[in-house]
């Protein structure tokens, strides 16, 4: 395993493939391994850099408080260490907040930015966000991480044919220390970039699930402010990179290769037949060779 150290953070990361650099940033409660469904498609054309954010995966908690700006600075320090002055960035959920913050910190260094089910502010400024923040924290404190993670996984992947994905998500999130999960959640609830969007110069693609936690209208408004393209994935919930792999990968490749977006009418949640194969395989790792893709020594 490869680690980067500085005075504030110790970051675990993986590097796959060759080509223009591309950073993939996971969401709250996840790790770099969450990108297993995307890496195989992306590493053929790009040098894919996959960090575990502080307090996630194999990365220990930060030495000071959790902040989105601190995460972004830590990733830029990692990229400086790797000799990467300029990179495309894809962020999922909280990872999208970190990606936006990175683009704001060094606007000229992020030519393309992909945001999956992400917003420009997570401050609890309406009742939905307030409820998400407080109920999530309350469940963790009352039930502990493992039980709270199972409820979250059930909400993300409720269909019977999503059993393998649901069990994997519950195991990954349930292994996160409660203090780390709550610290990252608080950092997200305190973060906003809405008043700094004018500083961004990246070409932006937003991928939005039809049934995400937060309203689609808010994402459409953000896309308008960013002059971004937006792909709406019908039938998908918050875990779009998991439940709509084909739509996610094709859309990201269109952004990264400056190609037109595919016809959006075809993008629906991956069909049950495909997901049933996941369940029969017994685990996501077997079906998509997660171990082969993400557990090799860095090249």
Located regions from the model:
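Flexible "cap/lid" loop of the alpha/beta hydrolase fold
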Residues: 104-105, 111-141
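Conserved alpha/beta-hydrolase catalytic His-Asp/Glu region
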Residues: 124-129, 143-199
